[in-house]
Amino acid sequence: MNNGIRFKLFLMMVLEIAIWGSWQVQIFNYMPMLNFEQWQQNLAGSMFAIASVVGIFFSNQFADRNFSAEKFLATSHLIGGAALIGAAFTTSFMPFFLCFLLYGLLYVPTISVNNALAFANLKDPARDFGFVRMGGTIGWIVVSWPLIFLLGAKSTAQEMRWIFLVGAIISFVLAGFSLTLPHTPPRRDVQGLDKLAWLKAVKLLRRPYVFVLFVVTLIDSTIHNGYFVLIGGFLKDPIKMPDNWIAAITTIGQVAEIVTMLMLGSVLKKIGWKWTMIIGILGHALRFAVFAFFDKPEYQALIIAVQVLHGICYAFFFATLYIFVDAVFPKDIRTSAQGLFNLLVLGVGLLIANFWFGSLKAQWTSAAGVVDYHKLFLVPTELAVVAMVMLLLFFKPPTDRPEEPGASAPAH
C-alpha cells in the first residue's frame, strides 16, 4: 500500500490522542485552583464518560451516516479547539463545564471516526492498524513534554490553563491536517445502531463466563479510571513532584504499554485468556499497593518506577479483552459486544471512578488539607484482588487461548 497514506494515518492518531492526553493527568489538580466544589469537580471530570455514552448511542452513528470522515474530523476539531480555549479562560464552574462538555461531545466521536477512516484506507488493516494505533500512544507521551516548559514547579491557575491551550493548538492543527486525509465518504448503507445485535450482545450475559467478564471489566474499568482521578494530586502532594513533571512521569506507563503490546501475542499463546487477564489486574493491585504503603517523598524513585506497571495493566487486561471478544463472540454481534464493553471502559467505569474516588478523596481529607492516600489507595487494591479472584474461580471461557491473537484496543 501507499506508505505515505499509512504515515498520514499514523500522524492523525498521534494528534488525536495528544489532544486527550494534554489535559487528562492534570485536570484534577487544576479544578481545585478555581475553587470548584467537590461535586463540580466530579461532574466536570465525568465529561468524557457523558460524551462517550452519547457517542455510543447516537453521535457515532450520526457521524458515520451523514458526513465524510475527513470533513467531520476537521469541523469537530476546529470547534472543539475553540471550546478548549473557552474552558481555559473561564474561571466559574458553569461556563467551564459547558465549554468542556461541548469539547467532549465533539471530540469523543472523532475517536471512532479516526478508526473507521484508518480501516477504510488501509490495504491490510489486520497487519497495518497496529502501527497506526501506536501513534495514539506516542501522542499521549509526546504531549506531556511541552508542559515541562509551560508549567512551573508550583503552577498557578494561569499557568495550568496551558493543559487546555496545548490541546486547543493541537486540535486546530489536526483540523487542518484532516483535510489532507484520504476522502472517506459517509456510510449511508449503515443502518445506525443495530438494536437486534445489541440485544443479542446483552443476552450473552446469560452465559456465566460473559457475565463474569462483564462484572470484572466494570471493576477494572473503575479502578483504571480511578488512577487518572487520583494520580495528579498524589504525585503533587505527598510525593512532592514538580507540577511541570507530573504528566511526563505518568507517560512512563505509556512507554511500557508499547513494549507490553509487542509481547502480548506470545503471552496469550503461552498462558491463555484467563491468566493473561489475571496478570493485568495484578498489575493494578501491585501499583495501588505501592501507592498506599509508600506514600512519602522519600519513595519518589519507587513511585516513578511502578508507573511501568501501566503497560501490564492496560495490555494484559484491556487489550486482551478486545481480542477475546473478537475471537470468541459470534461474528454478527462482535461490533455490538465491543460497544457494550466500551460502554463500561469509557462510560460507566469512568463515571463511577470520578464520583466515587473524588468523593472518597474529599471524605478522607483532613481539615488541614492532608489526604489519607494510604486508606484511599487500599480501596482499588482490594477491588483488584476481588476481580482477580472472580476470574480465577468463575471465568471459564469456551477456548483457553487464541489461535492467532492480534487486535488493537483504544489508546488510554
Would you name each region that the model predicts?
Residues 101-135:
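Cytoplasmic helix-loop-helix junction between adjacent transmembrane helices
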Residues 55-68, 151-152, 259-273, 361-362:
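Helix-to-loop junctions at the C-terminal end of transmembrane segments
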Residues 78-91, 282-296:
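C-terminal ends and interior cores of transmembrane alpha-helices
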Residues 149-169, 359-384:
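A membrane-interface helix-boundary motif in multi-pass transporters
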Residues 14, 83, 93-112, 218, ...:
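Hydrophobic core of transmembrane alpha-helices in multi-pass small-molecule transporters
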Residues 2-49, 209-217, 221-249, 318, ...:
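Helix-loop boundary and gating motifs at the non-cytosolic
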Residues 87-88, 171-182, 347, 373-412:
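Multi-pass alpha-helical transporter architecture, strongest
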Residues 1-3, 181-215, 237:
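Juxtamembrane intracellular "pre-TM" segments in multi-pass secondary transporters
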